[in-house]
Regions:
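N-terminal export/ancillary region detector
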Residues: 38-39, 73-75
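Short, charged interaction patches at domain edges and termini
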Residues: 1-10, 59-65, 106-164, 193-206, ...
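A broad, low-specificity signal marking well-ordered, structured residues that form hydrophobic/aromatic
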Residues: 50-52, 133, 185-186, 209, ...
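Extracellular/virion structural assembly segments
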Residues: 67, 75-103, 147-148, 199-241, ...
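A structural signal for the main folded, soluble domain(s) of proteins
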Residues: 84, 181-190, 195-199, 223
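Residues in well-ordered beta-strands of folded domains
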Residues: 53-55, 73, 134-136, 189, ...
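Small/polar-rich, solvent-exposed N-terminal microdomains that initiate assembly or binding
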Residues: 1-63, 96-110, 140-192, 290-291
Length: 291
C-alpha cells in the first residue's frame, strides 16, 4: 500500500472507545485531503460528525532523502464528542509505529503539536470545532552501497546476535512494525567517512556509523542500548560480509537522544579496509591432455 493508504488503514482501524466516527459509503469518515460536503449522499444516516481528514507535506532531506509533516484534522460539533476525546487515540496509533509503503523508504512519525480550532463551517444548528494534530515524518532509506559495507556489516551483526530485533532497511518489512520491549527495532546508517591510513596494498577508511534503537519507553531503550554497547565494546570489531574486520575505536551512547532524529549509538572512528589491487591469479598456459 502507498503511504496515504497505510495512514488510512491505521486511523480508520483505531479504537476510539465510546466515540463513533461518522460513516461515509459504509466506511469510517476518514479522508485523505478535504472531506466531502455535508450534503453528499454518501453520509450514512445523515450524520457527518465526528470525522477526520489528513494531509501530508513532503520535502527533500539531504540526510534522510525524504522528510515531511503530517496534519490530521479532527472535526466535531459542539454538542457531540469533543475533539480532545479523539486526539489521544490519533497520537497513539501514529506514533511509535514504522510504516513500509511500497516503492518508498520505511518511515515513522513523531508528534509535534495539537492545536484546537473553531471552524467557519457549521451545520444548521451546530458549530463545528476541532483539533489539528501535527506530526513530523522521518524516512529510513536503505544505505547499503558496495562491499565491504559498514551498514551491511552492522545489520549482519544484529541479525546474528540479536535475532529478536527487527532490522529497518530490509526489503521484507511488513506494512506496520510496532517495536516492543522484547522485540525492538534498529536502523543503521553511515553518517560520514574519510580516508585514513594508506598502504601499498590496502586503504583504511574511517567513518561514523549511527544506530537508532526503537523500543517503547526510555527505560527499555536504555537497557537495549547498554546491552548492545557493552557487547560491541567487548568485541572491539564487527566482521564484515567479506570476513574482514571493522574495528570499533570509539563508541558513544546517549540514551537522551531522539531515536527518530539523531540515533543513540555512535560508532565513531569505525575503521575498515579496502584492497587497492585485486588478488592476482596465475594463468595456466599450454595445457596438454591425454585421452
Amino acid at each position: 500500500m502507498k503511504l496515504e493508504e497505510l495512514l488510512f488503514t491505521r486511523i480508520s482501524g483505531a479504537d476510539f472507545g465510546s466515540v463513533k466516527l461518522a460513516q461515509f459509503d459504509g466506511k469510517p469518515g476518514v479522508f485523505f485531503g478535504p472531506c466531502p460536503e455535508d450534503t453528499d449522499r454518501g453520509w450514512t444516516d445523515a450524520r457527518q460528525y465526528p470525522r477526520i481528514s489528513y494531509g501530508l507535506d513532503l520535502r527533500g532531506d539531504p540526510d534522510r532523502q525524504t522528510a515531511g509533516t503530517l496534519y490530521v484534522d479532527v472535526w466535531c460539533t459542539e454538542d457531540g464528542p469533543a475533539p480532545e476525546d479523539i486526539e489521544p487515540t490519533i497520537r497513539a496509533v501514529l506514533c511509535g509505529v514504522i510504516m513500509a509503503p511500497e516503492e518508498d523508504a520505511p518511515c515513522s512519525f513523531s508528534w509535534q503539536a495539537s492545536q484546537t480550532f473553531r471552524s467557519s463551517r457549521e451545520t444548521v444548528v451546530e458549530k463545528v470545532i476541532g483539533v489539528t494534530v501535527t506530526f513530523d515524518m522521518y524516512a529510513f532509506p536503505e544505505q547499503i552501497t558496495s562491499d565491504p559495507d559498514p551498514v551491511l556489516a552492522m545489520q549482519k551483526y544484529f541479525r546474528e546476535n540479536y535475532p529478536e530485533i527487527t532490522i529497518i532497511g530490509r526489503a521484507d518489512l511488513p506494512d506496520f512494525t510496532e517495536p516492543t520491549e522484547e522485540h525492538p527495532a534498529v536502523y543503521c546508517r553511515l553518517e560520514s567517512y574519510e580516508l585514513g591510513r594508506e598502504y601499498r596494498t590496502v586503504a583504511w577508511l574511517e567513518g561514523t556509523v549511527i544506530c537508532h534503537i526503537f523500543a517503547p519507553g526510555a527505560s527499555s531503550r536504555a537497557r537495549w542500548i547498554r546491552a548492545i554497547v557493552d557487547d560491541l565494546s567487548r568485541r572491539g570489531e564487527v566482521i564484515m560480509m567479506d570476513t574482514s574486520p571493522m574495528f570499533l575505536r570509539s563508541i558513544r551512547a546517549d540514551t537522551t537522544l531522539d531515536p527518530l532524529v539523531h540515533g543513540q549509538i555512535h560508532l565513531k572512528k569505525a575503521t575498515w579496509g579496502i584492497l587497492k589491487n585485486p588478488p592476482y591469479h596465475h594463468g595456466i598456459n599450454h595445457i596438454h591432455t591425454n585421452d
